[in-house]
Amino acid sequence: MRSKRSTKRTKRASATQLYQTCKAAGTCPSDVIPKIEHTTIADQILRYGSMGVFFGGLGIGSGSGTGGRTGYVPLSTRPSTVSEASIPIRPPVSIDPVGPLDPSIVSLVEESGIVDVGAPAPIPHPPTTSGFDIATTADTTPAILDVTSVSTHENPTFTDPSVLQPPTPAETSGHLLLSSSSISTHNYEEIPMDTFIVSTNNENITSSTPIPGVRRPARLGLYSKATQQVKVIDPTFLSAPKQLITYENPAYETVNAEESLYFSNTSHNIAPDPDFLDIIALHRPALTSRRNTVRYSRLGNKQTLRTRSGATIGARVHYYYDISSINPAGESIEMQPLGASATTTSTLNDGLYDIYADTDFTVDTPATHNVSPSTAVQSTSAVSAYVPTNTTVPLSTGFDIPIFSGPDVPIEHAPTQVFPFPLAPTTPQVSIFVDGGDFYLHPSYYMLKRRRKRVSYFFTDVSVAA
């Protein structure tokens, strides 16, 4: 009969058991040695990665399951706290028991005696002597005395300071006598206070404390945007401003115009001046300077509207009266016209635009050239060539602009060679510059000159003639 083969697989030994037997023989599988010696890929990642990342105290990868430094805390409960043991309060001294027959009032004066805290230190008394003994001898030899002087100086830096002990505390209902030494020695130097020079003149004394009552004058705010500006023409505003606000009887009322004036509700009255209607307060005057004038100003408050609660609403008005004007300093200078009128006609050869050309030689009969818009006349000498002289060029402006005389420009020239036969020049040898008025540029100057393209002959083998 054929027996059934067992299909159960035999378990292999663990890696630790295999490593102990196969390490010496060198027959260990490839996965046993790295696992036991911790040289797997995962171990190498943890080894080199721990150099840059630190997870100390968190319990990651340790397998201990402690939950880190603080441990695991259940969500539903709180960690228990240790309560301190309560210590009963007891008196510091023992209390004697009191019997039922003992009196309730204890007399402390009878039992208490005189408490001697301490006896004072004895004061040494100098010894009493009867004097010096005088002995007389017949020896005439002079006596030699050996005298040595010793001086001692105490350094307070290295001397211990004297400490004054506090008195001993004591409490009793009888007689109390305290005795302690209250005399102490010190090593510091006592310097008497001296009186410096005392000045009796209080006018020259300067103090850093500000003088009360002297302050910087505040700005009046007369020309703010919220203030209405009203100019007063009536000169009564200077002496009796109350007459412009309400009717008064001068026989019974005397008002100082330099003080603030307050009025009751004058809405049912008509003011003599309509500019002062509904005025309830007119403040003190002020003299100011505004735009070369001396100005007399007063601020006033109006009561235009009154609410049921008693609040008043009104504008703030600045009343001013210009007393006099201030003339600007300096003498006035009469201005002279610089140019002629556009309707003035100009004459030819009136001295405008004269250009002088100085020569180094003298001629007998110089030639004169007069150039005009209509004709041009030229004359030359029969002996010498063309000699430039004063040339007058009247320039006409197309926009009737006044023409002013320009400066004289001297031009120097080299001496001209004299030929054996007369030579009439075709063009003048002197450049004439004209300044003044307006001009038109010649159309040929509008075209820009075309720059010649330069070609480099560095790589050529031929020479170019200059």
Curated annotation (Swiss-Prot):
A GO cellular component entry from the record: viral capsid
Disulfides per UniProt: 22-28
Keyword match Nucleus: no
Localization of this protein: Virion; Host nucleus; Host early endosome; Host Golgi apparatus
Motif stretch (Nuclear localization signal): 1-13, 447-455
A GO biological-process term: viral penetration into host nucleus
A matching Pfam family: Late_protein_L2
UniProt xrefs under InterPro entries: Late_L2 (IPR000784)
Highest taxon of source: Viruses
Subunit note: Interacts with major capsid protein L1. Interacts with E2; this interaction inhibits E2 transcriptional activity but not the DNA replication function E2. Interacts with host GADD45GIP1. Interacts with host HSPA8; this interaction is required for L2 nuclear translocation. Interacts with host importins KPNB2 and KPNB3. Forms a complex with importin alpha2-beta1 heterodimers via interaction with the importin alpha2 adapter. Interacts with host DYNLT1; this interaction is essential for virus intracellular transport during entry.
Function in brief: Minor protein of the capsid that localizes along the inner surface of the virion, within the central cavities beneath the L1 pentamers. Plays a role in capsid stabilization through interaction with the major capsid protein L1. Once the virion enters the host cell, L2 escorts the genomic DNA into the nucleus by promoting escape from the endosomal compartments and traffic through the host Golgi network.
Protein name, per record: Minor capsid protein L2
Annotated source species: Human papillomavirus 31
Gene that this sequence comes from: L2
